[in-house]
């Protein structure tokens, strides 16, 4: 169950949003402090499962063949690419960039990771979308299911960064549960935990920011 303070902040953000003809996303602005972000080890780069989901489709692509590819399709992967497609994507950078923008998470059988790094690393790497490796005998269905409820939060070298954590069609309680899950992970990840968090705000796409903590 979400904290009361988080639920109230979400309610305020939703109530103060301007009326639009489209469903707005709900975003989180995270401000850190007392961290040297020039050191890669201090940067935030986390995949976080949202207990309430994102409220919209999270797309997953899988590089696999044979039974793994079949299971990936059954599990709801949005794209399943055979290994020979890696070379084709690497040779067609506009297509690769479009795919990287559209897909939230990539998965690849471990045997194909070196080729993906060589052919697609310059496209996927900077976007934080290098595939999660799938070892032999691993359950691709479980991984896809998990990623379909996850988001990636990345600070890069900045103390302030943003993440989409829901949509306005979700209940305040659902959005608040997602926020609290992110805060909990941040407090675990950061060297000094809560002391490294300066402030966190929630807002809709076009609405004003409301302080969560």
From Swiss-Prot:
Q: Output the Gene Ontology terms for molecular function.
A: rRNA binding; structural constituent of ribosome; tRNA binding
- What are the record's GO terms for cellular component? large ribosomal subunit
| SUPFAM superfamilies membership | Ribosomal protein L1
What's one GO BP annotation on this UniProt entry?
A: regulation of translation
InterPro entries attached here?
Answer: Ribosomal_uL1, Ribosomal_uL1-like, Ribosomal_uL1/biogenesis, Ribosomal_uL1_3-a/b-sand, Ribosomal_uL1_arc, Ribosomal_uL1_CS
Keywords attached to this Swiss-Prot or TrEMBL record, sorted alphabetically, are: Repressor, Ribonucleoprotein, Ribosomal protein, RNA-binding, rRNA-binding, Translation regulation, tRNA-binding
Tell me which Pfam families the record gives: Ribosomal_L1
Tell me how this protein assembles.
Answer: Part of the 50S ribosomal subunit.
Q: Which NCBIfam families match?
A: PRK04203.1
Q: What does this protein do?
A: Binds directly to 23S rRNA. Probably involved in E site tRNA release.
Q: Which family does it belong to?
A: Belongs to the universal ribosomal protein uL1 family.
Q: Which PANTHER family match?
A: 54S RIBOSOMAL PROTEIN L1, MITOCHONDRIAL, LARGE RIBOSOMAL SUBUNIT PROTEIN UL1M
Q: Which protein are we looking at?
A: Large ribosomal subunit protein uL1
For this protein's source organism, the top of the classification is: Archaea, Methanobacteriati, Methanobacteriota, Stenosarchaea group, Methanomicrobia
Instruction: Name the gene that codes for it.
Output: rpl1
């Amino acid at each position: 169950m979400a904290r009361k303070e988080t639920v109230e902040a979400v309610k305020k953000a939703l109530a103060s949003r301007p009326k639009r003809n489209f469903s707005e996303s709900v975003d989180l602005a995270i401000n850190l402090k007392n961290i040297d972000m020039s050191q890669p080890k201090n940067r935030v780069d986390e995949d976080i499962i949202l207990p309430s989901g994102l409220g919209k489709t999270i797309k997953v692509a899988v590089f696999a063949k044979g039974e793994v590819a079949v299971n990936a399709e059954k599990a709801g992967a949005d794209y399943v690419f055979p290994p020979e497609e890696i070379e084709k994507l690497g040779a067609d950078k506009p297509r690769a960039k479009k795919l990287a923008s559209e897909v939230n998470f990539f998965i690849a059988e471990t045997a194909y990771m070196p080729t993906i790094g060589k052919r697609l690393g310059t496209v996927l790497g900077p976007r934080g979308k290098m595939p999660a490796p799938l070892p032999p005998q691993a359950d691709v269905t479980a991984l896809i299911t998990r990623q379909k409820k996850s988001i990636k939060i990345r600070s890069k070298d900045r103390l302030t960064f943003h993440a989409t954590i829901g949509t306005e069609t979700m209940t305040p309680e659902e959005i608040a549960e997602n926020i609290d899950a992110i805060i909990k992970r941040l407090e675990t990840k950061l060297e000094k935990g809560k002391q490294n968090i300066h402030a966190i705000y929630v807002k809709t796409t076009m609405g004003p920011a409301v302080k969560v903590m």
